[in-house]
From Swiss-Prot:
Pathway: Cofactor metabolism; pyridoxal 5'-phosphate salvage; pyridoxal 5'-phosphate from pyridoxal: step 1/1; Cofactor metabolism; pyridoxal 5'-phosphate salvage; pyridoxine 5'-phosphate from pyridoxine: step 1/1; Cofactor metabolism; pyridoxal 5'-phosphate salvage; pyridoxamine 5'-phosphate from pyridoxamine: step 1/1
Listed name of the protein: Pyridoxal kinase
Positions bearing Phosphoserine: S59, S213, S285
UniProt: ATP binding residues: D113, N150, Q151, F152, E153, T186, S187, V226, D227, A228, T233
Similarity comment: family membership: Belongs to the pyridoxine kinase family.
Chain's gene name: PDXK
CDD domains named among the record's database cross-references: pyridoxal_pyridoxamine_kinase
Length: 312
């Protein structure tokens, strides 16, 4: 019998579209994982639309759901995956749950996308309350095993600015020293060796060699920029990175190549479809730019490698 691998995913939920748990659950299931989803919010659609309605789960309600799992003794997990959170007490409760689950299963891997803000034209801006930063820095990152910040979030967590690839590697080492063995800076403002049409991402993974010493693999990836604003890409990235690092635990290069290549196929299919719907010369709407997830099932399951990672 095939070994079951179960993920507890605590993220947002939308009725229409693909962000948060809606962007993470399908690819993880396609790749063979059982996914138990806790919806931190339930909205009609993502907040990039003109209107949205819905409810927000608070920390007491999260505790209640977790207590229900505990009472039935079904709170055994191999992975925890978290993304966007707006509330400090909710985030602290997530940390408590992760710590309890790790006591039960010391091999549990916590994958955290520390969603706090982004960089536009060199200027960084937070889109969560400022009081979340110390919680991420002091409580969340120390219990995380894999983190997927963008450049701005990596700078926030370490208090260091990144202007060069060398500085990015130093920041990733600082993040390692805070706890996680795998760090992927999912996007950066750094100029790619391939030119300004490319977006650069960087990764670093520490593994223990048979002799007990720590070995670090560092990689760089360059992805062709797409001129559109997608929502849910970070959630999809973190979910697929979880899956591919599980399948290639000591090879970040291969895990990232599969993750980024699958992302490429999903985004290309999405932009092609959005442009066909919007018509020539018309900017696609948020609804038209929803990720073409179901249509990309084969690419998620078995991505043709179109992005090669460079080992640094």
């Amino acid at each position: 019998m095939e070994e079951e691998c179960r993920v507890l995913s605590i993220q947002s939920h939308v009725v229409r579209g693909y962000v948060g748990n809606r962007a993470a659950t399908f690819p993880l299931q396609v790749l063979g994982f059982e996914v138990d989803a806790v919806n931190s919010v339930q909205f009609s659609n993502h907040t990039g639309y003109s209107h949205w309605k819905g409810q927000v789960l608070n920390s007491d309600e999260l505790q209640e759901l977790y207590d229900g799992l505990k009472l039935n003794s079904v709170n055994q997990y191999d992975y925890v995956l978290t993304g966007y959170t707006r509330d400090k007490s909710f985030l602290a409760m997530v940390v408590d749950i992760v710590q309890e689950l790790k006591q039960q299963n010391p091999r549990l891997v916590y994958v955290c996308d520390p969603v706090m803000g982004d960089q536009r034209d060199g200027e960084g801006a937070m889109y969560v309350p400022d009081d979340l930063l110390p919680v991420y820095r002091e409580k969340v990152v120390p219990v995380a095993d894999i983190i997927t910040p963008n450049q701005f979030e990596a700078e926030l967590l370490t208090g260091r600015k990144i202007h060069t690839q060398e500085e990015a590697l130093e920041v990733m080492d600082m993040l390692h020293s805070m706890g996680p063995d795998t760090v992927v800076i999912t996007s950066s403002d750094l100029l790619s060796p391939r030119g300004s049409d490319y977006l650069m991402a960087l990764g670093s993974q520490r593994t223990r060699a048979p002799d007990g010493s720590m070995v670090t693999q560092r990689i760089r990836m360059e992805m062709h920029k797409v001129d559109a604003v997608f929502v849910g890409t970070g959630d999809l990235f973190a979910a697929m990175l979880l899956a591919w690092t599980h399948k290639h635990p000591n090879n970040l290069k291969v895990a990232c190549e599969k993750t980024v290549s699958a992302m490429h196929h999903v985004l290309q299919r999405t932009i092609k479809c959005a442009k066909a719907k919007s018509g020539e010369g018309v900017k696609p709407s948020p609804a038209q730019l929803e990720l073409r997830m179901v249509q990309s099932k084969k690419d998620i399951e078995s991505p043709e490698i179109v992005v090669q990672a460079t080992v640094l």
